Design a protein with these regions (language model features):
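Acidic/negatively charged segments and metal-coordination signatures
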Residues: 1-326
């Protein structure tokens, strides 16, 4: 008979969640809750949904304190009630002209919405958590994610600002959702007479997506229309894009002609820095390109009006490319 004791199995441990895991849980919970808000128009349904979606997060918090399953449920319910009202009041509803349908949160002495019959301040409202940071463009993007592509033109029809649309489109472009960006932004440029410089970012993003989708005719048509805009910033945006198009096909003379016209219209536009260095690089004038890049990086770094970090990084990259080609 073997007298040796059998080895004991290690106790099961709770998986360790990273900050990224927690962010993923929250992001998925928020995204799905927005869908419930749009579909149900029922705060109770949103609370019930969030209670389930946030249970893993509640379990993590409670288990760290040696809590019980009942305490996990109470924690999940408390999170759900607080977050449901904040999400509700920040969610732009398509049928409400992409504005939230505001709903007053429970008063501190009112019965708690969870049904406990206790006062809100003694139940789900007992925490000291600060308000969520829910940027309007992020919430608009969450709502649009629940709409079919055929409805992505609705924000333009409802008067959502070009700046807001550009913020959403920029994220989608980073995610390579080019067709969604085109569906979102194309309606904005049907009537350029209504637009001013606030639409310039959206125009550049749309032209980038046309390029990514190899829709050259659509891009070139937008360039020509921008060049005829009554707004000098939009005209400059069209000319700057024309300069890159001409450079790509080896038309050096017209590339510089378009660049100089754009510079005349908007001499303080930081994006001219990158374009000038690109044109010099395209001609193989690498020494001049490095000199102009150094000049522009100093100018951009000293500019108090704009956050030029992305442009400076892009210029650094162009200089590095030029050095690698030597």
């Amino acid at each position: 008979m073997n007298s040796r004791a059998k080895p004991t199995m290690p106790a099961m441990q709770q998986p360790v969640l990273t900050d990224a895991d927690l962010q993923t849980i929250m992001d998925r919970a928020f995204q799905s809750a927005v869908g419930v808000i749009i579909a149900s128009n029922d705060i109770a349904a949103v609370i019930a949904h969030l209670r389930q979606a946030l249970r893993p997060l509640a379990a993590l918090v409670v288990n760290e304190q040696g809590g019980t399953p009942a305490e996990i449920e109470r924690a999940a319910q408390g999170m759900a009630v607080r977050l449901a009202y904040e999400l509700w009041n920040a969610t732009p509803i398509p049928e409400n002209h992409f504005r939230p349908r505001k709903l007053a949160p429970p008063e501190r002495n009112a019965p708690c919405p969870c049904g406990s019959q206790r006062k809100y301040k003694q139940c789900c409202g007992a925490g000291n958590e600060g308000p969520l940071i829910l940027p309007p463009d992020e919430m608009l993007g969450r709502v649009l994610d629940h709409l079919p592509r055929t409805r992505l033109g609705e924000p333009v029809a409802q008067g959502i600002s070009p700046h807001m649309l550009a913020l959403v489109a920029s994220r989608w472009c980073d995610e390579q959702r080019f067709d969604d960006v085109i569906a979102l932004l194309e309606p904005l440029f049907i009537d350029l007479g209504k637009l001013d410089e606030r639409a310039a970012d959206a125009a550049n993003i749309l032209m980038n997506c046309y390029l990514a989708r190899q829709q050259y005719d659509a891009r070139n048509a937008l360039v020509e229309r921008l060049k005829k805009s009554h707004n000098r910033v939009l005209r400059s945006a069209g000319l700057q894009r024309e300069a890159t198009v001409c450079s790509d096909r080896g038309d050096v003379r017209n590339a510089w002609r378009a660049f100089n016209e754009a510079r005349h219209l908007t001499p303080d536009d930081p994006s001219l820095s990158h374009l000038e260095v690109l044109l010099l690089r395209a001609e193989g004038r690498d020494i001049e390109a490095r000199e102009r890049a150094d000049y522009w990086m100093a100018v951009l770094a000293a500019d108090p009006r704009h956050d030029n970090r992305a442009l400076i990084e892009a210029l650094h990259a162009l200089v590095a490319e030029a050095a690698a080609d030597d």
